[in-house]
Design a protein with these regions (language model features):
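Active-site and NAD+-binding cores of ADP-ribose-processing enzymes
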Residues: 1-33, 39, 71-200
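Extended catalytic/binding region for NAD+/ADP-ribose chemistry, centered on the ART fold
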Residues: 40-71
Length: 200
């Protein structure tokens, strides 16, 4: 594949990301997974990836509710046990991040020959190939071009999500681990997305 011409989206210092995690990981370092089982993971497992959102709703829809079947169910629900088992990691940006912007008009088709269905597919061959390619791109001085990927949310359109490469770790800070039930935006998520909390 020819070297793609992908625009960069610069995320300034001071931005705050959100990542939904298991409460059992409270206080641990940020984890950049190398399972090869997520959308922009490296298929060769050479680098790790951390998936974050800019808001709680997108972070939840891309994690806890990523395989929902709401169109087939009369009620949208989550158990109290599940709520209590989750926390939100507030992640601060210490230095500007350069993200490969796959949300820019025409980029998916012109640079990678992909449509939205392929980008959002649960078969990750295309997106993992793109991640590996973007990870290796460098500037003329040899510096890495991108710290991660900005891409359309599959489950919370038209929001965008971020896949951060592990080399971005030094530009990030774990600000706080917040119990999901205590998050300031949790009540509005339940209301806006019509989700009920079941007692069991």
């Amino acid at each position: 594949m020819p070297t793609p011409d992908v625009p960069a989206r610069i995320i300034p210092a001071g931005e705050l990301f959100q990542h939904v995690s298991r409460a059992s990981y409270r206080g641990t370092a940020l984890h950049f997974g190398r399972s090869g089982g997520s959308r922009f993971d490296d298929p060769a497992l050479r680098f790790g990836t951390l998936y974050v959102g800019f808001d709680l709703s997108t972070a939840l829809m891309e994690s806890v509710f990523r395989q929902h079947r709401w169109s087939r169910r009369a009620k949208r629900a989550i158990t109290r046990t599940e709520v209590y088992s989750r926390m939100v990691r507030a992640i601060g940006v210490l230095e500007p991040l350069s993200l490969a912007d796959l949300t820019a008009p025409g980029v998916m088709a012109s640079q990678f020959g992909l449509n939205l269905a392929q980008l959002a597919s649960r078969r990750y061959a295309h997106t993992q190939r793109i991640a590996a390619l973007l990870h290796e791109l460098a500037e003329p001085d040899g510096a890495h071009r991108f710290d991660g990927v900005l891409y359309p949310s599959r489950n919370n359109h038209p929001a965008a999500c971020v896949a951060l490469f592990d080399r971005a770790a030094e530009k990030l800070s774990l600000v706080d681990d917040i119990a999901l039930r205590d998050h300031v935006d949790w009540p509005s998520f339940l209301s806006n997305y019509q989700v009920v909390v079941l007692p069991a």
